[in-house]
Amino acid sequence: QNENIKLISNEHICHELINTYQDDGIILEPAGVLSICALDKIPQEHLKNKNIVCILSGGNNDVSRYPEIMEKSLLYLNKKHYYIIEFPQKPKQLKKFIFNVLGENDDITRFEYIKKTNKSFGNVLVGLETSSSEIIENKMSDNNFKFKKILESDLIYSYLV
């Protein structure tokens, strides 16, 4: 691989689409932000005291896709995470999860009861927006919630994102 060629993830592109829209009010197409994304891949010391030109292109973007773009941006920023969580089949478990696991600024963005696996437990697909998945995971463990984080390499990930 040529060191001058930069690989840009879909999530990074989505992040920059959101940034240019929110910060500058510019609606670009995904290909239009590639030059901005590439700048993030170049060490800052190589850019110092140089004139840099980025070509931005197109408003050829369907605004109805912005919720999907926003989600991919949050994934890129490591602020959105998906889990399969085993909830005990007894009263007040969701309340326990909300009060003991979630922080003040954490948010449940998806909650799907998958199925009761037995009389004692049921699996739930949970999407969380959080600034620290590590803290969430530690709190889930501390509160005896069994869970599996859904990773990009998991087959179900492409279904969710």
Predicted features and spans:
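PLP-dependent amino-acid enzyme catalytic core
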Residues: 1-161
